[in-house]
């Protein structure tokens, strides 16, 4: 086969055997035994084959959908606590993908879309829950920060950029993207700035909620393809967002006060009032678990937006015991990750129980939840990770409470010490 751009050996003008265009009308003309094909026809054939493969390949729906119990078990491997939220998420995600598989309505009953709202303090595991679910289902996942979003036409990130990010995660495969999960963080930060609609435009608050409405409920978003046009006749990729699961999360600081105000209405005043003692007061997590749509409206979310997020799960604040478990128990626990890093240098890393408790205590005092654990561990091990590659004979590093409190450096055990200890035992 040869690439003929000039006239043939005989000086004769060559034509594509398929479309009839001459070699001067196309970029490339590929020659075969007494036949020629141009680059445009090759591209057209590729497109036809790709479309046919797409029509056949989505039958991967035949793969068994994990049950809510199986989804919950997978979450348990990576996320500590939050039992109620795990159950709510597992059922909602299972029902969403069940709805996608049974798209033809039975007896005219169309299944509604159930997007999810996660309410919980910073570092309680909202993002990790969404990410772990996407990984267990092997579907594309992307995250967006609501604070960077603005209405179309204003400086900032357009809401449709979220779909662009999802497409990037699956190499612009629209079919895959339409089965994906989108997590929008800091959703509480786009609450309306006051109860009364303002005369001035609120482009990063209520305006963004309005912009997100259609996207979350389901619309056909027009997204520019990677590297310009995919086909000469097509400028945008059409993505049906009604098949995408949206999970929104936020800390909703101060929401508990809104709930308490509602709960206290009707409790009586004067001699008929019910006075609660200190020990009768509910914790913030207990109060948040009683959230109602009206509380979210009072907080600053518009009713239409709340209506698009019918499944609400509240996460509890992690206590010190839970943080200790997070450090050591999950499959990708922090201590296991750092142990793997040290193993690459041929060194075993040991965290003693008192060290784990001290790390958890420090994270609690910083009020950063599980999110602050990594920075604490990184700070403790920084000097050791800097020195170990240059020191020979180290076989073990031990971290105890005094190391966490900054009173001493991690204990380094050398090969010769190990040998002496072994001979002493004999």
Curated annotation (Swiss-Prot):
Key words of the record: ATP-binding, Chaperone, Metal-binding, Nucleotide-binding, Zinc
Sequence intervals crossing the membrane: none
SUPFAM superfamilies, sorted: Glucocorticoid receptor-like (DNA-binding domain), P-loop containing nucleoside triphosphate hydrolases
One example GO MF annotation: protein dimerization activity
Disulfide bonds, paired cysteine numbers: none
Keyword Cell membrane: no
Domain ClpX-type ZB: 4-57
Example of a GO biological process term: cell division
UniProt-annotated binding residues for Zn(2+): 16, 19, 38, 41
Positions annotated to bind ATP: 121-128
UniProt GO cellular component terms: HslUV protease complex
Subunit note: Component of the ClpX-ClpP complex. Forms a hexameric ring that, in the presence of ATP, binds to fourteen ClpP subunits assembled into a disk-like structure with a central cavity, resembling the structure of eukaryotic proteasomes.
Family: Belongs to the ClpX chaperone family.
HAMAP family reported in the protein's UniProt record: ClpX
Main function: ATP-dependent specificity component of the Clp protease. It directs the protease to specific substrates. Can perform chaperone functions in the absence of ClpP.
Protein name from the UniProt record: ATP-dependent Clp protease ATP-binding subunit ClpX
Organism: Shewanella sp. (strain ANA-3)
Chain's gene name: clpX
